[in-house]
UniProtKB/Swiss-Prot annotation:
Bias-annotated ranges (Polar residues): 1-16
Protein name as it appears in the record: Proteasome subunit beta
Subcellular location(s) per record: Cytoplasm
Pro-peptide region(s): 1-44
SUPFAM superfamilies the record matches: N-terminal nucleophile aminohydrolases (Ntn hydrolases)
Activity regulation statement: The formation of the proteasomal ATPase PAN-20S proteasome complex, via the docking of the C-termini of PAN into the intersubunit pockets in the alpha-rings, triggers opening of the gate for substrate entry. Interconversion between the open-gate and close-gate conformations leads to a dynamic regulation of the 20S proteasome proteolysis activity.
Broad class of where this protein is predominantly found: cytoplasm
InterPro entries (UniProt xref): Ntn_hydrolases_N (IPR029055), Pept_T1A_Psome_bsu_arc (IPR019983), Pept_T1A_subB (IPR000243), Proteasome_sua/b (IPR001353), Proteasome_suB-type (IPR023333)
Length: 239
């Protein structure tokens, strides 16, 4: 039997070759215990992604908690621009989610530099899924929304690396409450402004019942030209 080449990159977790390693090098590892994770800042969270006739709208709450018992921050921006026409939410531990986004941005830049073309949103979602499965990012469950030549896309990415596309999706601790609002208010071919109101309504409903969500809403509007992100402490500003 042929032995693995010891000169090839290996993961820091089990020292076996991984098909999910990024092109830039190894996915970073961690040695945190379950007790350590209880003291990690977590987003808790409710995040929503909606595909519209004009692009994509993403909404998140603003709360971070420590060990699920203490509100450690009331102004966390849980959605970040990941590409000129795509945005990604932060769900899970704050540090893990931020590391995930930094790593993914670097990989996208490398992908486009090597190929001389923009990455498609489908390829970006696949890359994000590979990272979620192969990296120590503490069970993140983000939403990716983007626009490319093929249309407007919303993907949910599960901790095992699964990538699922839908017209709208919800992740986070408040998803059961928010889904009820979206099932009632979502319509095909909404404008971005209409979708922002529906998404904000879903976040508000989750904030009322989910202790991991709260303190306002961030709304991201994604078009083929740019990503605009704005925070609102008062839901009445957008409803």
């Amino acid at each position: 039997m042929r032995q693995p080449d010891s000169s090839l990159p290996r993961t820091g977790q089990d020292h076996t070759l991984s098909p999910y390693e990024p092109e830039l090098g190894e996915v970073p590892s961690n040695d945190l215990s379950m007790a350590d994770l209880d003291n990690v800042n977590k987003t808790g969270t409710t995040t929503i992604g909606i595909s519209t006739a004009e692009g994509v709208v993403i909404a998140t709450d603003m709360r971070a908690s420590l060990g699920g018992r203490f509100v450690s921050n009331k102004n966390v921006q849980k959605v970040e621009q990941i590409h000129p026409s795509a945005a990604l939410t932060l769900v899970g531990s704050v540090g893990g989610a931020q590391s995930f986004i930094r790593s993914l941005r670097a990989e996208v830049d490398l992908y486009e530099a090597r190929r001389g073309e923009d990455i498609s949103i489908n390829a970006l979602a696949t890359l994000a899924g590979n990272f979620a499965r192969g990296g120590p990012f503490f069970a993140i469950n983000p939403i990716l929304g983007g626009v490319d030549d093929e249309g407007h896309h919303v993907y949910s990415i599960d901790p095992a690396g699964g990538v699922m596309k839908d017209d709208y999706t919800v992740t986070g601790s408040g998803l059961t409450v928010a889904y009820g609002t979206l099932e009632r208010e979502y319509e095909d071919d909404m404008t971005n402004e209409e979708a922002k109101r529906v998404a904000a309504s879903g976040i508000k409903a989750a904030v009322e019942r989910d202790t991991g969500s709260g303190n306002g809403v961030f709304l991201a509007t994604v078009t083929d030209e740019d990503v605009e992100i704005k925070g609102h402490k008062d839901f009445d500003e957008v409803l």
